[in-house]
Design a protein with these regions (language model features):
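Active-site segments that bind and position negatively charged phosphate/pyrophosphate groups
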Residues: 1-67
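C-terminal charged capping/lid subdomain of soluble metabolic enzymes
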Residues: 38-118
Length: 118
């Protein structure tokens, strides 16, 4: 959901390719999982270190700022996997244990992104 919103908010331009969007989406999902206290800091650091060791040197702040927030949230809310007014996300409880959650409002995600997009 995060990756799709990133791609869509840039109109699927060559500025951000699909693989980069997926990596950014994974990093965002990890950070959101950590912010919800679903994921332990130790697991977060292990995964993030592994991703960073791929030498992709990609950061969400390279492509997005708080100015992009409403557009990102618009595309997240439009995702076909959502139910009712809640945004459906795949988050991580621990390494190897993803969890599908359908309980996040645009307001909750906006609060997260206000800190995340610094």
């Amino acid at each position: 959901t995060f990756a799709h919103a990133y791609e869509a908010s840039l109109n699927y331009s060559k500025k951000l390719n699909h693989g980069e969007a997926v990596i950014l989406g994974m990093k965002t999902a990890l950070s959101f999982s950590l912010s919800l206290k679903m994921l332990e800091k130790r697991d977060y650091n292990l995964i993030l270190n592994h991703v960073n060791n791929l030498n992709l040197s990609i950061s969400v702040n390279k492509f997005f700022t708080k100015k992009n927030l409403n557009k990102i949230l618009f595309f997240m809310a439009k995702d076909k996997k959502n139910k009712s007014q809640k945004i459906n996300l795949v988050l991580l409880k621990k390494i190897g244990s993803p969890q599908i959650n359908n309980e996040y409002s645009k307001e909750r995600l906006k609060k997260f992104f206000n800190d995340y997009l610094s």
